[in-house]
């Protein structure tokens, strides 16, 4: 599988990254190890995780995904694996350092704990899972100045990362769920103060949420920050498994097996919106008309985007994982690509 260099780093990663958010909740340790083995047999060398996983996050399972990866990783040649993890941002999970800010002490503690769970001496790419500051993320469409709060500065966060790079505990730094302002500020602060420069941004990108194209595409191109695209299947909506009815009258299927039925409806409301389901149904119809599955259409389309360095895929079975990887070999016709743009123009970013 072709490798891509991330940002200005020397990390060379596969065009597909294995996401692991199901390990420890929807997948057992043995199943997680099987997925890792299969992914690497197909040429994937890139794993993404975070201290917070698995999802849905809860105190009882906190860190389980990293522990599962760790028992696999200790049996592998370490230089064969490009490992990415993240530090949780503030205010969402009170069981993670009391939900506190991204202070230097918090970042250092998070790295030390992740290294123990992962059974490794270093993490190749360490990412800030979401901003410490007030920012429009996770389905919030507009910035709200009334939600401003005190938080650790970007300079303080990068200083802590710099200490960890010098100590050999992390190699490169990235951000996640960021905005054009955030990317620009991280790059400017790093260059102004001689601190680690972010190599990557990990943001959602899929057929029902193309918000990356609203300024982040140019920002990342000009700052040489690589996109790691997560949720390419729109939390599973783009597979069609959550839909019943026809393309004109799609209905959510509560009996489907997956994340959107396993967890409470408020877990991912943007993927449950009527307009999201309407768009997903249209993409299903398009995929069927061209002899492919909804998953293959959604992933092949992501794999074809010029600004995506690596697409993060996740699965709960080896069959799903195989289909997701196989989609890399599907080239979408000009007719299909034009149809995608027509649907997008009619139902614009419903899951943003």
Predicted regions span which residues?
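Beta/alpha (TIM)-barrel catalytic core signal, keyed to glycine-rich beta->alpha loops juxtaposed to Asp/Glu
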Residues: 131-342, 347, 351
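Short beta-strand segments at enzyme active-site cores
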Residues: 46-50, 83-86, 122-128, 174-177, ...
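Aromatic/hydrophobic pocket-lining residues that form the small-molecule binding cavity
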Residues: 32, 65, 107, 111, ...
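Active-site mouth loops of central-metabolism enzymes
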Residues: 20-30, 93-105, 145-152
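Active-site groove signature of glycoside hydrolases
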Residues: 116-139
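Surface-exposed, active-site-proximal loop segments in enzymatic domains
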Residues: 58-63, 89-104, 134-143
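N-terminal binding-site loop/beta-alpha segment at the start of enzyme catalytic domains
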Residues: 1-86, 105, 112, 121
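Residues at the N-termini of beta-strands
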Residues: 15, 46, 122-125, 172, ...
């Amino acid at each position: 599988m072709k490798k891509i260099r991330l940002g200005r780093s020397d990390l060379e990663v596969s065009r597909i990254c294995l996401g692991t958010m199901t390990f420890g909740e929807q997948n057992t340790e043995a199943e997680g190890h099987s997925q890792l083995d299969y992914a690497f047999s197909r040429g994937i060398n890139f794993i993404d995780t975070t201290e917070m996983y698995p999802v849905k996050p809860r105190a009882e399972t906190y860190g389980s995904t990293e522990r599962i990866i760790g028992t696999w990783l200790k049996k592998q040649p370490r230089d064969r694996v490009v490992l990415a993890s993240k530090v949780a941002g503030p205010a969402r999970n009170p069981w993670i350092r009391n939900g506190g800010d991204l202070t230097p002490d918090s970042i250092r503690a998070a790295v030390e704990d992740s290294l123990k769970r992962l059974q490794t001496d270093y993490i190749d790419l360490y990412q800030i899972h979401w901003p410490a500051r007030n920012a429009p993320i996770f389905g919030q469409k507009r910035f709200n100045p009334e939600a401003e709060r005190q938080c650790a500065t970007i300079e303080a966060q990068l200083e802590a990362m710099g200490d960890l790079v010098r100590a050999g505990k992390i190699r490169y730094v990235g951000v996640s769920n960021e905005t054009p302002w955030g990317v620009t500020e991280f790059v400017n602060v790093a260059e102004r103060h001689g601190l680690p420069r972010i190599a990557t941004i990990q943001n959602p990108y899929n057929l029902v949420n193309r918000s990356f194209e609203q300024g982040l595409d140019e920002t990342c191109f000009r700052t040489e920050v690589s996109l790691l695209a997560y949720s390419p299947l729109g939390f599973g909506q783009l597979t069609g498994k959550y839909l019943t009815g026809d393309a004109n009258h799609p209905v959510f299927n509560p009996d489907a097996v997956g994340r959107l039925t396993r967890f409470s409806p408020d877990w991912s409301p943007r993927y449950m919106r009527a307009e999201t389901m309407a768009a997903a149904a249209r993409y299903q119809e398009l995929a069927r008309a061209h002899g492919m599955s909804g998953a293959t259409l959604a992933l092949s389309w992501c794999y074809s985007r010029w600004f995506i360095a690596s697409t993060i895929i996740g699965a709960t079975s080896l069959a799903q994982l195989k289909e997701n990887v196989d989609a890399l070999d599907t080239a979408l016709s000009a007719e299909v690509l034009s149809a995608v743009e027509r649907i997008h123009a009619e139902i614009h970013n419903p899951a943003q």
